[in-house]
Every structure is written in structure tokens, then in C-alpha cells.
Amino acid sequence: MIEPVQVLWSPAGTSMPSLGDRALVDVTDGDTPNIRMPIRMLSVDTPEVTARTPEGAAAVDEKFAQLAEWIDQGKAPISAGLAADLHPRLATGRAGTLQFEQGKQASAFAKHNVETRLARPGQEPRNLFIRVTETPFDDHGRLLAYIAPNYSPKELETLSRAERSTFNLDLLTAGWAAPFVIFPSIPGELDLPLLVGAAAQARAAGTGIWSDPATLPAYEYRAMEKLYSITKKIVAGEPVRGADRFAWRDRYCADMRSRQLHGPEDYGAVPPEYRLWIWSRDVAAAVDRLNLVPAPALVGAA
């Protein structure tokens, strides 16, 4: 029989956050099992390979071409401004294939870059340096982090911030990722200019994904997959009402240069490298913490 305890922290019926299931790698000691965990690299978004095969990508080609037709016919729930921007890239007949091919190239670059920068001749490869932000996990249980080679204090004394760049930054520099900074996980004051500069230079030079004007950044590709599914239901006469019609977009966008906040379909007014994405649920907090100013369209002035 134990004595009654007087400390209450988690009321009955509540539970700790879950990260789902993970593969056990080994057990170091009694209280230290090691698991395998995926990392979602912060502030970057590489092309998707969810089509899995060239045939799967070709199927997306057809879906997006069909979506372009529905947009022409006014059947898709999308604003005229964003539709005008996206339509030419959806109507190419190769939007899915382009995304898949770019995704494979981005993966190959990332693998080669990691192996090269971690390698030490005659020694074991370097460990990874991992830095997380105030929101350590995403909704899929992935660790949100910046990763880089782990250098010794002596080595760090001789390296500039650019020379000890994160693998996240390397993807932007090579043009194999679109910048994807999401509040509140914003790089620090010394790192954010590096990120913006790398992304701007890659886009201006037409490297990586920016070599093709028909490129859909991965966040647009995912949104268009959702918009296709919603529009397909609408065309089929299935009931899609209210907020469900616009479930394909749930992020606002702030311009890092002016702190102006734009609606979910007005991000085209901001160059990709200056886009700060904000989930709808976080808009109030972002406006308060960053002193954002609503764009005229958000307050009915345009």
C-alpha cells in the first residue's frame, strides 16, 4: 500500500503527445533504446516523388491537365489571380513528370552532398549536427531540424557561416529546393539573410528546379493535388460545401521585406525567397509577435 500523492499534473483521461511507431535500432542500456526517426528539414521544400514511378507521374500529368480545363471552365474553387499564375504550368501536360524528375534529381543531389561533406579521408564519417526549433515535431511525427556536418570547436574557429552551411542551405544554393520558412520556425538573424540570398541567387541563375519556367514548387504541387480532388467531387455533383471547398490551402503568407500579410491565395505578390508561411491557426500569434500588417485585400480595401 502506497501513501496518497499530492501532485497532479496530467488529469485522468489526458495523454502525452504521440509520435506514432518507430523501428527499434538497438538498446544502449536499460533506459536508452535507440530508434530510427525521420527528419523533416526546416525552411526548405524539395520536389515530391510521391508519384513513385514514371507511370504514376504520367497519371498526375493527366490530372493536372484536367484541372487546368476545370479552371478554364470556372469549376475549380480558386481565385482568378492565382488561377492565372498556375494555369500555364498545370496545362503543360507534364507537370507531374517534371515534379517527379526534379524530385529524383534533388534526392540524388542531397545524398551525394551529405556523403561528400560528412566524409573524412582515413577516418569515420562525421556525425550530424542537429538543431531544432521551438516546435520540434510536425504532424507526422518527424523531427523538424536544421542539419549539418558536426565540426570540432577548433574547426569552427576557421569556418565562416557559409562554409559550415547546413544541408538545408545547400539545397537552396543548388536550386534543388524552394525556400519554405514557416512561422514560428524562422531562422535566426544571421542565418535568415543567408537563406534568402541563396534562394534568390539560385532562382535568378535558373539552377535546379528554377531552370524550368513550368516548375511547381512542392508546396504548390501538393496544393494542386488537393484542389484536383476537391474539384473532381464538385464536377461529379458531390456536395462540397463551405470550408471544405477551400481545404486545399491553409497557409497565409507574409512578405519578409514589408511585414505585409497576404491571404492564402495571394502569395504570388511575394517573390518565393521572401515568403514567410503561416498556418491559419497561427495567424493571430504571428501578427502579434512579428507586428504584421494586413494587405488591403484582407481588410476589404481592395
Give residue ranges: language-model regions.
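Small beta-barrel nucleic-acid-binding modules, primarily SNase/OB-fold domains
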Residues: 1-302
